[in-house]
C-alpha cells in the first residue's frame, strides 16, 4: 500500500504488537482453544503485513489457507480432545519452561546482535533490464502461476501429495 509515512509506521507498530501479543498468547495460554485463537490473530496480522508490502496475492493465500483452513482444522482437533487433561497438575513454571526461555532469549539476543551488522545490499535480487520490461507486462498472479508450473513444479507436486496424505489421514481418524 502506498500510505503516508506516519500512517504506515503506525500500522507497522500496531501489527507488530499484534504479532507479539498473539505469539505470546499461543505460547503462554494454558487453554488450547485460546491458543488456537491467538494463532489466528498471528496469521491475520501476518497477512496484513503482506498487504502493507503490496503482496496482495500472498495475503489472500495466507488468509484462505492458513486462517481459513489450517487454523479451523486446529480448532476442530482441539475441540475433539478431552478438555480436562489440560488442567491436571498445572504448574505456572517448570524446568522445561526455563530451558525454553533461555534458548529463545539466546536466539533473540544473537539475532539482535547479528541483524544490524549484516550487509543487506548484497542480498537484494538484481534483474536484467529486459526482464524488468517482461515483468511489467505480466501481473503478479500470472508470474506465480508461471513459476509454479515451470520452476517449482516438483515441489508443488510434492506439497500436493503431502496434503493428500494428510487429508486421507484426517478422514481415517475421523471415521474411528
Curated annotation (Swiss-Prot):
Keywords: Chloroplast, Membrane, NAD, NADP, Plastid, Plastoquinone, Quinone, Thylakoid, Translocase, Transmembrane, Transmembrane helix, Transport. It is an enzyme of class 7 (translocase). Its EC number is 7.1.1.-. It is found in: Plastid, Chloroplast thylakoid membrane. Disulfide bonds: none annotated. It is a multi-pass membrane protein. GO terms for molecular function: NADH dehydrogenase (ubiquinone) activity; quinone binding. The chain crosses the membrane at residues 10-30, 32-52, 61-81, 92-112, 152-172. One of its GO terms (cellular component) is chloroplast thylakoid membrane. It holds the Pfam family Oxidored_q3. Belongs to the complex I subunit 6 family. NDH shuttles electrons from NAD(P)H:plastoquinone, via FMN and iron-sulfur (Fe-S) centers, to quinones in the photosynthetic chain and possibly in a chloroplast respiratory chain. The immediate electron acceptor for the enzyme in this species is believed to be plastoquinone. Couples the redox reaction to proton translocation, and thus conserves the redox energy in a proton gradient. NDH is composed of at least 16 different subunits, 5 of which are encoded in the nucleus. This is NAD(P)H-quinone oxidoreductase subunit 6, chloroplastic. It comes from Panax ginseng.
Amino acid at each position: 500500500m502506498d500510505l503516508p509515512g506516519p500512517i504506515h509506521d503506525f500500522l507497522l507498530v500496531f501489527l507488530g504488537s499484534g504479532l507479539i501479543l498473539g505469539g505470546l498468547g499461543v505460547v503462554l495460554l494454558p487453554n488450547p482453544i485460546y491458543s488456537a485463537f491467538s494463532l489466528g490473530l498471528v496469521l491475520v496480522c501476518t497477512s496484513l503485513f503482506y498487504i502493507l508490502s503490496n503482496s496482495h496475492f500472498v495475503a489472500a493465500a495466507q488468509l484462505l489457507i492458513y486462517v481459513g483452513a489450517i487454523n479451523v482444522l486446529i480448532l476442530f482437533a482441539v475441540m475433539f480432545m478431552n478438555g480436562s487433561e489440560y488442567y491436571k497438575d498445572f504448574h505456572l513454571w517448570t524446568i522445561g519452561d526455563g530451558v525454553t526461555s533461555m534458548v529463545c532469549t539466546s536466539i533473540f539476543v544473537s539475532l539482535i546482535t547479528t541483524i544490524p551488522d549484516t550487509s543487506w545490499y548484497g542480498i537484494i535480487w538484481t534483474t536484467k533490464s529486459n526482464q524488468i520490461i517482461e515483468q511489467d507486462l505480466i501481473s503478479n498472479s500470472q508470474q506465480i502461476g508461471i513459476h509454479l508450473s515451470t520452476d517449482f513444479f516438483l515441489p508443488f507436486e510434492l506439497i500436493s501429495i503431502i496434503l493428500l496424505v494428510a487429508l486421507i489421514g484426517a478422514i481415517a481418524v475421523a471415521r474411528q
